[in-house]
């Protein structure tokens, strides 16, 4: 059971400039503590069906959304700690199930269907999802630099800042070097506020006063939109030539 984690929370996203981030970091210092890992490089593989069903459902704004991903902290080795995550969103509430294992075992389970992760309730949910979404495979690599903080008085409150968000659709392997195409401008950061209940008043007041507004920004979703746009443009060029 120690290798399983279950989250239920609300997540709110904001796109910030470098100055906005700097000012907020200074303001929230009395309320938040830096995560013990400090600044991390987070590497992810998002899994999807051959027709990209999961991400299409997500960006179409369905009430129920689901994502399956493999995550490591930094470039992976076979024995690196890895997390297989099943992330569901229903009516704005995020439910995340996570299994911790070694990277090589995670790949064998997700890509080859081998029985390499411990049996548990979360494993059963993963098995069901893998059977439901036939032909599921790695679709997009995403990495980013993350700074994470948690509340001094409320440990369910987490605030993260993601920068240097990179994506690619080739070399879909977390043991490969960290590289890809950028999603954000150089001075931008994606802030995520994660709460188990209501947002604290000090944070609500700050966001309101500084006119910081929520966005529905999705890293995988924006990468997918770029893929579709470029495919359509390429198709249009070919039709024009013919």
Task: Label every model-predicted segment.
Residues 1-242:
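Phosphate-end processing signature that detects enzymes handling 5′-triphosphorylated RNA
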């Amino acid at each position: 059971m120690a290798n399983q984690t279950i989250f239920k929370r609300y997540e709110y996203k904001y796109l910030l400039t470098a100055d906005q981030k700097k000012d907020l970091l200074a303001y929230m210092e009395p309320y938040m503590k830096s995560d013990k890992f400090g600044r991390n490089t987070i590497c992810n593989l998002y899994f999807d069906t051959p027709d990209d069903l999961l991400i299409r459902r997500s960006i179409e704004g369905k009430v129920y959304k689901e994502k399956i991903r493999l995550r490591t902290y930094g470039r992976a080795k076979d024995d690196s700690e890895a997390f297989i995550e099943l992330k569901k969103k229903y009516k704005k509430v995020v439910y995340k199930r996570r299994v911790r294992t070694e990277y090589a075992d995670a790949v064998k389970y997700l890509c080859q269907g081998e029985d390499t992760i411990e049996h548990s309730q979360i494993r059963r949910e993963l098995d069901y999802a893998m059977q439901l979404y036939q032909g599921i495979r790695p679709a997009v690599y995403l990495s980013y630099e993350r700074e994470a903080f948690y509340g001094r008085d409320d440990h369910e409150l987490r605030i993260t800042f993601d920068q240097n968000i990179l994506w690619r659709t080739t070399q879909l392997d977390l043991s490969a070097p960290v590289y890809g195409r950028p999603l954000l401008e150089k001075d931008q950061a994606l802030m995520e506020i994660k709460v188990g209940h209501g947002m604290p008043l000090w944070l609500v007041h700050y966001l309101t006063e500084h006119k910081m507004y929520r966005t529905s920004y999705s890293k995988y979703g924006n990468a997918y939109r770029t893929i579709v746009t470029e495919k359509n443009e390429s198709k249009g060029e070919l039709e024009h030539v013919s």
